[in-house]
């Protein structure tokens, strides 16, 4: 997309955190990962105590992961899984942290991280557990 289209998709300067978050989600869906990164960073910097901060931090990690920026993605997912460990995003953040570590060639650490998902979140959604199992096989844990 051209720069004009990206600008048009962003909410106004006075947008609420929810509006910014929704805009970032839309950017991800359109595969505008750099734009999504910028939007989620804006939320994190401007509203660090908002209830959507764990989600915004997770989605920042997604925008980085999808561009194979595994190191920065890992940092975002680690933050969600430690600082916001009780958030709904935490189990999936641990999964994505493991995937990021695998992308960095850190197989042992990735495998240990995958094991943490079930240990820390035994009641997590079956879709997350199944994804962990797939990743463990893919990585060779």
Predicted feature residues:
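Acidic, proline-/serine-/threonine-rich low-complexity intrinsically disordered segments
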Residues: 1-23
């Amino acid at each position: 997309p051209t720069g004009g289209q990206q600008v048009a998709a962003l909410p106004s300067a006075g947008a609420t955190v929810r509006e910014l978050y929704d805009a970032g989600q839309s950017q991800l869906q359109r595969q505008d990962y750099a734009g999504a990164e910028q939007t989620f960073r804006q939320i994190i910097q401007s509203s660090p105590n908002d209830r959507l901060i764990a989600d915004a931090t997770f989605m920042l990690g997604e925008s980085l992961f999808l561009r194979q920026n595994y190191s920065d993605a890992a940092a975002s997912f680690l933050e969600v899984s430690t600082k916001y460990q009780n958030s709904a995003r935490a189990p999936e953040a641990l999964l994505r942290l493991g995937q990021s570590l695998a992308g960095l060639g850190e197989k042992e650490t990735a495998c240990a991280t995958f094991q943490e998902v079930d240990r820390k979140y035994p009641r997590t959604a079956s879709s997350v557990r199944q994804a962990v199992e797939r990743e463990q096989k893919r990585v060779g844990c």
